[in-house]
């Protein structure tokens, strides 16, 4: 069916069909880059990076506007990673979203401290 209308479902771009049908490997590609960024920054942030900072790292890696990455793209990519058994998780602390890349549970005290820290 895709060949009849000239669409390659495995094309590595964020196009109309990939967005509409959830096909293509754009989000898996972003997922791999998310893993790379989280691994590179883990020694600085302990495995907890703000979604905004993560997206900024990805935008620096992907120079062209056509390949710009939004926070929604990151969230979708992380949800695709979960399907593969990944331990990456998006958590909300205060009003900010963070990506946790370590399998550690945060207790109430950790959450409270992080919430206070996000205010500054």
Swiss-Prot record:
InterPro entries under this entry?
Answer: ESCRT-2_cplx_Snf8, Snf8/Vps36, WH-like_DNA-bd_sf, WH_DNA-bd_sf
One family from Pfam that matches here is EAP30
A GO cellular component entry from the record: ESCRT II complex
- Which BP terms in the Gene Ontology apply to this protein? protein transport to vacuole involved in ubiquitin-dependent protein catabolic process via the multivesicular body sorting pathway
The entry assigns this protein to a family as follows: Belongs to the SNF8 family.
According to UniProt, the name of this protein is Putative vacuolar protein sorting-associated protein 22 homolog 2
Originating organism: Arabidopsis thaliana (Mouse-ear cress)
Gene responsible for this protein: VP22-2
């Amino acid at each position: 069916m895709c060949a009849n209308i000239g669409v390659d479902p495995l094309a590595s771009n964020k196009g109309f069909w990939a967005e509409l049908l959830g096909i293509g490997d754009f989000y898996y590609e972003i997922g791999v880059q998310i893993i790379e960024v989280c691994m590179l920054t883990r020694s600085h942030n302990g495995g907890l990076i703000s979604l905004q900072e993560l997206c900024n790292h990805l935008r620096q890696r992907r120079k062209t506007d056509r390949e710009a990455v939004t926070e929604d793209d990151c969230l979708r990519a992380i949800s695709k990673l979960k399907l593969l058994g990944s331990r990456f998780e998006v958590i909300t602390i205060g009003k900010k979203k963070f990506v946790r890349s370590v399998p550690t549970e945060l207790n109430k005290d950790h959450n409270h401290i992080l919430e206070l820290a996000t205010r500054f």
